[in-house]
C-alpha cells in the first residue's frame, strides 16, 4: 500500500488528495477508496519509525562518511478549513497576505537533513522528521518539539554528530543539557542577556558561581569588539565579511554551557548586521556564518513541497490521518530527491529542459520540479511495460502524452 500510494502521489500531476493518489497509481478501479483512506486513518505504522529509516537512508547515501549531519529546523502552516480538522487552529503564518500574519490550519515542526549534491551549487534540505503542533497547556511547544525530533534523529543515527541550525524562535531553556553529540546554532536575539564565563573556584564555603558578570548589550559589544575579515560561501556566492567572536554564556537559554557568539557585518563600517550563537566551540566564525546561511534551504524545501510536491493537499480530518498525510507526502518528496541524486540525474537533463523551454537561458542546474517530472515520467513509462507485451491502449497513450505535456509546461 505504501509503495502504491507513493507512486500514485508522484504520478498524479493534479491535486494530490488521497483519492488522487489512488488514481495516479492506476488502482482506482481495483481498490476501494476506503482502503486508501484507512491506510492513513487506521493502518498500523509509525511516522517516527519511518522517519528513522529515512534519516539513515539519507545519511548513508548523501552524507560523506565521517561528516557531521547538518539538520535544519523550521515550522510551517498547512492551511485547512473546518472546526472538525484535528489540531487545526490559528497560528502565525509568515506567508499570509496582509499585515496580520496569521492563518488557520495545521502547524508542523519539520527537521530536515541538509546535504550538498554535486550538480547543485546550493545546499538542499530533505525533510525527515515531523511533529504536529497542538495548542493546549499540556502540549509541547515548538522548541520542545524540535528538541524531541533532534533527539530521535540522534538515536536513529547511533549518536552520530548532529549540527542543528534554526532561526531565533528556536532558543530557550529546553535546550539546556544537550548531549555532547548535538550542537545548536541560531540567531541571537538583540536583547539577549549574555554573561562572562564562570570564574575559577575561590576555595571559600558556599556554592561556586555559575556565571560571570553580565556583559554589555550587543550594540555596545560590537563597538568594543575587534572585527577580522573572513570569506564565506553562502547563498550560492562567495562573499567577504567581517566577524568578531565572543566566548561567553547565554545563561537564560543554555545555562552553564559555554557558547560562541559571532557578530557579522557585511557593509556597515560600525556596529553589526547579524549576531549568531552556537554551542559548537570547535567551528570557526566563517563556519558559523555558512552554517546559519544553510538554514535557508529548509525554507526553500518547504516552499517546493507545497508548490511542487502536493504536500498539504489531502483533506483528512481525523487524528491519525491528519498526523500521517503531511509526513507521508514530505517523505515522498525526500525519496524523490534521493532517487534523483543516486540514479536519476543525467548531465543532459538541463539541456533537455532548456530545449523544451528555451526562455530559460540561464538555467544551469536541475530544479526540484525537474526531479519530480523525471521520476513521474519513469513511473508512467513503467505502466506501459506489461509482462505480456501488448500494444498500448488509447488510455495509456493519453497518460503518457499528459506526462510529457507536464514536462513541457
What are these regions (language model features)?
Residues 135-204:
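Domain-level cores of phosphate- or acyl-group-handling catalytic modules
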Amino acid at each position: 500500500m505504501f509503495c502504491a500510494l507513493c507512486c500514485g502521489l508522484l504520478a498524479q500531476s493534479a491535486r494530490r488528495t488521497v483519492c488522487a493518489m489512488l488514481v495516479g497509481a492506476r488502482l482506482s478501479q481495483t481498490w476501494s477508496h476506503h482502503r486508501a483512506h484507512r491506510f492513513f486513518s487506521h493502518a498500523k505504522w509509525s511516522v517516527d519509525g519511518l522517519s528513522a529509516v529515512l534519516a539513515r537512508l539519507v545519511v548513508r547515501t548523501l552524507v560523506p562518511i565521517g561528516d557531521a549531519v547538518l539538520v535544519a529546523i523550521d515550522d510551517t502552516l498547512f492551511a485547512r478549513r473546518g472546526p472538525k480538522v484535528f489540531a487545526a487552529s490559528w497560528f502565525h503564518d509568515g506567508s499570509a497576505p496582509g499585515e496580520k500574519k496569521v492563518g488557520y490550519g495545521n502547524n508542523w515542526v519539520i527537521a530536515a537533513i541538509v546535504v550538498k549534491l554535486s550538480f547543485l551549487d546550493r545546499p538542499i534540505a530533505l525533510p525527515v522528521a515531523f511533529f504536529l503542533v497542538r495548542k493546549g497547556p499540556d502540549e509541547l511547544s515548538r522548541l520542545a518539539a524540535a528538541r524531541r525530533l533532534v533527539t530521535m534523529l540522534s538515536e536513529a543515527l547511533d549518536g552520530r554528530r548532529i549540527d542543528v541550525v534554526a532561526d531565533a524562535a528556536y532558543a530557550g531553556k529546553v535546550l539546556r543539557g544537550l548531549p555532547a553529540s548535538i550542537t545548536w546554532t541560531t540567531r541571537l536575539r538583540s536583547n539577549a542577556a549574555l554573561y562572562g564565563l564562570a570564574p575559577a573556584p575561590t576555595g571559600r564555603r558556599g556554592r561556586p558561581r555559575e556565571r560571570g558578570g553580565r556583559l554589555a548589550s550587543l550594540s555596545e559589544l560590537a563597538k568594543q569588539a575587534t572585527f577580522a575579515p573572513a570569506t564565506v560561501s553562502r547563498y550560492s556566492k562567495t562573499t567577504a565579511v567581517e566577524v568578531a567572536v565572543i566566548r561567553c554564556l547565554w545563561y537564560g537559554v543554555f545555562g552553564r554551557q559555554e557558547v560562541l557568539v559571532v557578530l557579522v557585518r557585511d557593509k556597515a563600517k560600525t556596529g553589526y548586521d547579524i549576531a549568531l550563537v552556537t554551542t559548537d566551540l570547535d567551528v570557526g566564525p566563517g563556519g558559523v556564518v555558512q552554517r546559519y546561511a544553510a538554514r535557508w534551504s529548509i525554507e526553500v524545501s518547504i516552499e517546493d513541497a507545497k508548490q511542487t510536491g502536493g504536500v498539504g493537499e489531502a483533506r483528512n480530518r481525523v487524528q491519525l490521518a491528519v498526523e500521517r498525510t503531511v509526513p507521508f507526502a514530505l517523505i515522498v518528496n525526500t525519496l524523490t530527491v534521493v532517487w534523483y541524486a543516486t540514479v536519476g540525474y543525467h548531465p543532459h537533463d538541463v539541456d533537455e529542459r532548456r530545449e523544451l523551454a528555451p526562455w530559460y537561458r540561464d538555467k544551469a542546474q536541475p530544479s526540484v520540479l525537474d526531479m519530480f517530472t523525471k521520476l513521474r515520467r519513469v513511473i508512467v513509462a513503467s505502466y506501459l511495460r506489461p509482462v505480456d507485451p501488448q500494444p498500448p491502449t488509447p488510455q495509456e497513450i493519453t497518460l503518457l502524452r499528459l506526462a510529457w505535456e507536464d514536462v513541457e509546461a
